Design a protein with these regions (language model features):
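N-terminal single-pass transmembrane signal-anchor helix
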Residues: 2, 7-40
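Short, flexible helix-coil linker/hinge segments at the edges of structured domains or between repeats
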Residues: 6-7, 49, 53, 72-77
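Membrane-proximal N-terminal amphipathic helix
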Residues: 37-70
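Extracytoplasmic/periplasmic, Sec-exported soluble proteins
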Residues: 47, 51, 86-90, 157, ...
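Short, glycine/small-hydrophobic-rich surface segments
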Residues: 62-99
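Intrinsically disordered, low-complexity regions enriched in Pro/Ser/Thr/Gly and acidic residues
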Residues: 92-222
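Short, low-complexity, Pro/Ser/Thr/Gly-rich segments in the mature regions of secreted, periplasmic
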Residues: 218-232
Length: 232
């Protein structure tokens, strides 16, 4: 008499097994996200240390060796970049003026593009940081009492700042994130002479870092312009 075969029962994944798989996937995604954030933070730190600080050092060496600010007259100095014309000193003009005085430049995007630096934003898209020098007539400085007044100052302009990079540089230079006060300011806030409220209001940069859970990675991350007040 033939013995009937027992059919093996086909069973799917149990709830516990599926839960374990989902947890593992979530951990992998989280690790990748954290790794990406750590990498961008390290890149921003490198930009602050090598590129931004490198240009500050180059500027200070220029003024120390020449006895005047860039593209000003050493024999009849005005104390203002480009002689106070209001025009920015950028790109080839900036590079040539520095090299003509024997000033070593920081490594930038490439040879001949030392005033530019390419980096990736939170979307992985390329952004370009660009440095120029100029004189402004309306840098806000403390005046009598609790008022503020516009003063002429030489500044270094940084174009192409994402919120993440602007915050990193602001923290490194001023020790806090503040778009209005300190040496490093946003171009739309540097000349604000309105009185401080009580209690003082926060002064965030106009763009904030994107929220990972809500922003669209297909969108372009906006950039800003920052002004750094020079020592001379």
């Amino acid at each position: 008499m033939p013995i009937p075969r027992q059919r093996r029962r086909c069973a799917g994944f149990t709830i516990l097994e599926m839960s374990v798989v989902l947890v593992v996937i979530a951990l992998i995604i989280g690790a990748v996200s954290v790794g990406r954030d750590v990498y961008r933070s390290a890149v921003a730190e490198r930009i602050s240390t090598d590129f931004v600080q490198g240009w500050i050092i180059a500027y200070d060496r220029y003024t120390s060796q020449v006895g005047a600010v860039p593209n000003d007259s050493p024999s009849n100095p005005t104390g203002r970049i480009n002689g106070g014309t209001g025009n920015a000193l950028c790109d080839d003009d900036l590079r040539d003026e520095m090299l003509r005085r024997g000033i070593a430049l920081p490594q930038g995007r490439a040879e001949g593009f030392e005033n530019r630096y390419v980096y990736q934003d939170a979307n992985g898209s390329p952004q370009q940081l660009r440095v120029c020098l100029l004189n402004v007539n309306d840098w806000s400085e403390p005046s009598t009492g609790s008022s503020y007044a516009p003063r002429p100052r030489n500044v270094m302009r940084f174009e192409g700042l994402t919120a993440e990079l602007a915050h990193q540089i602001d923290l490194r230079i001023d020790g806090r994130i503040d778009a209005r006060f300190g040496r490093f300011r946003e171009d739309s806030r540097y000349d604000d002479t309105s009185p401080i409220g009580s209690p003082p209001a926060d002064n965030p940069w106009s763009e904030s870092e994107p929220t990972p859970s809500s922003y669209n990675r297909e969108e372009n991350i906006p950039t800003m312009v920052g002004y750094l007040k020079m020592n001379r």
